[in-house]
Amino acid sequence: MNTFPAPAKLNLFLHVIGRRDDGYHLLQTVFRFIGYSDQLGFDVTNDGVIRHLNLVPGLTDTDDLCVRAAKLLQKRSGKEMLGVGIHLSKNIPLGGGLGGGSSDAATTLIVLNRLWGINWGRERLMALGLELGADVPIFIYGRNAFAEGVGEKLEVINLPPAWYVVLTPPAPISTAAVFASRELTRNTIPIKMAAFSMAQGHNDLELVAMRLQPVIAEWLDWLKGRHGSTKVAMSGSGSCVFAEFPSESAAREVLRQLPDSMSGFIAPGLARHPLSDF
């Protein structure tokens, strides 16, 4: 069984600039892929059955975005006679704001599009992915991007090489709970990316997430106390926090200082999704 990567993403900033009539929030953010991935294997069958061969603890078939993605693609493409067994090796933490579930769904769509002989273009796959979640399209798009709308309006952005220290507090957060908070700022002034410095950006979800899980503030403060970082922030709706460094050696030195009571990893920023040309 061949395996395929489903990389994590970071939101280098995340501004909430409004809310649509249907309740969805309007965002501006920059997505960056990092070299830290789940791994998925696919065993194509001819029985029309979609199976998850090793369901992740804490997830049901209903919650499993890989299975949902496969079933949606199977139905819309008319490939009901084809099935698949999906094996997921999970590395990206659940509820961490790193897009793990969305990335798994995107890799499922990208790979089965090829293995099932559907061969749709990326735009069609992105539209299908949006039905599964607002973060799924960026992983199908395959490039670091400035995103607007609910996260589906994407524009390629070229980012300099960087390394990231990502801390993983044991405090998963519900994205829905963060966005539902009355304390959430929803009126950040929209920016034009061409005239914007990444260092100016912030994450409007941080304060709400820190109230829901105070440990996030403690881990974020620890990162802010390290020297040499060019940016420190929370990713997505949390709970993971990160610091950006210009070199691998600088990132490794900070990880070396990490107290035993904390957990995390380092990863390089990627120029594009590893399956961008698949």
Swiss-Prot record:
Gene3D superfamilies: 3.30.230.10, GHMP kinase, C-terminal domain. Pathway: Isoprenoid biosynthesis; isopentenyl diphosphate biosynthesis via DXP pathway; isopentenyl diphosphate from 1-deoxy-D-xylulose 5-phosphate: step 3/6. InterPro entries: GHMP_kinase_C_dom, GHMP_kinase_C_sf, GHMP_kinase_N_dom, IspE, Ribosomal_Su5_D2-typ_SF, Ribsml_uS5_D2-typ_fold_subgr. The keyword Glycosyltransferase does not apply. Keywords: ATP-binding, Isoprene biosynthesis, Kinase, Nucleotide-binding, Transferase. Its EC number is 2.7.1.148. This is 4-diphosphocytidyl-2-C-methyl-D-erythritol kinase. The lineage of its organism: Bacteria, Pseudomonadati, Pseudomonadota, Betaproteobacteria, Nitrosomonadales.
